């Protein structure tokens, strides 16, 4: 299974070995106590935290010294040896954000943990290269990791993918905008929309409205078309986060349901009712034909 990291341990270790041979990675024997002491000193001196520069005490350990420690059974991890300088800047084009500028990465981050498995950063580079990934779409909280990932890809000799960093969906919380939270907000869970009786198709269409402002106009002109035919364009996505709008979502939901045939409305309603409204489920099952008539030709008030 190419997606199961534990089954790909040998692959990651082979690439880590390559970096070590190239002088771009090294075994680090720093103990938790040493790292904690380092953090305290950095905090006291009010300088950037991390394992870099003079703080990277095992960075220049000789091959003989490292081999001796490994042979003695000392636990270790493997760190990437950065050649960056925090005082230098790099310029990068993000598909969504446009041109962005960062300090170079100078952190000797962990690439192989003590259990032999990779960190996210290393797995991202190795897996995406082997799976021929051309575009990486992820949350903008990862934007600051771009300098590290660019350096890592180049050190491995890999083609760098195009990055597209999406902004989070926001919520109005008593007049203040904040990111929708998995801990605080039920709207962050897919199950919430199912419980509310909102079809998955409606949620997808609403998200397309947020993703590309021209989707709404496309939908008006192509009412019978499957949304899959809409061409989502990353460079037209909003740079800032969109505000979650339940009224708009319900409006989209009504429009989506209106395109369902009566049989689909009935079957989807029954599935929902069997889980969330037993009384309604019994009514629907009692007379399917009558239910279909009501769905197809809703009673009109005079």
Feature-to-residue mapping (PLM):
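Aromatic/His-enriched, Gly/Pro-containing loop or helix-boundary segments
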Residues: 1-15
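Active-site cores that bind ATP or allylic diphosphates and position pyrophosphate for catalysis
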Residues: 5, 18-21, 25-165, 170-180, ...
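Hydrophobic (often cysteine-bearing) scaffold residues that line and stabilize catalytic clefts
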Residues: 8, 12, 145, 199
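Residue patterns forming the tRNA-binding/recognition surfaces of aminoacyl-tRNA synthetases
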Residues: 13, 22-24, 209
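Catalytic adenosine-cofactor/nucleotide-binding cores of aminoacyl-tRNA synthetases and other
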Residues: 156-292, 296, 300
